[in-house]
């Protein structure tokens, strides 16, 4: 083995140290990515609950059934009845629809198939879009 071969071997050992360091940073990056995904999901859940609560609280006070809950009920052909709190689409469908809306608003995709119709829903949507822009920056 020559001296140049030994020097090249020392460089190879340095490269292995660099690779180990990169692996440590990759594990850190995966943890940060997981934390971001969990926090984004939690924020989306909270916003979906708020979006549903706005529509649910506002529904009895609207002169016409124009909220997103009423649009969803029309789409599923399951109308809300006057004195029946269990009428309308199943709660699972309402939650998934609200969650879908908040994620499309937070990520600024906004397909528009679930849309805010009342002023309160529109104000909430503006807030969700601004929050989504802030979280992406």
Regions found by a protein language model. Give the residues of each.
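Pore domain of cation channels
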Residues: 1-10, 32-44, 48, 84-137
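Pore-domain transmembrane helices of cation channels
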Residues: 1-4, 9-82
């Amino acid at each position: 083995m020559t001296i140049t071969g030994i020097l090249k071997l020392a460089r190879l050992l340095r490269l292995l140290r660099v690779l180990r360091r990169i692996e440590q940073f990759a594990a850190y990056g995966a943890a940060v990515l997981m934390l971001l995904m969990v926090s984004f999901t939690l924020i989306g859940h909270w916003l979906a609950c708020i979006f549903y609560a706005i529509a649910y609280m506002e529904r009895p006070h609207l002169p016409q059934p124009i909220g997103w809950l009423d649009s969803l009920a029309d789409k599923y052909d399951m109308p809300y009845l006057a004195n029946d709190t269990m009428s309308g689409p199943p709660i699972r469908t309402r939650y998934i629809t609200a969650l879908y809306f908040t994620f499309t608003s937070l990520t600024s995709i906004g397909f528009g198939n679930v849309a805010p119709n009342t002023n309160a829903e529109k104000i909430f949507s503006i807030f969700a879009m601004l929050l989504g822009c802030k979280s992406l920056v």
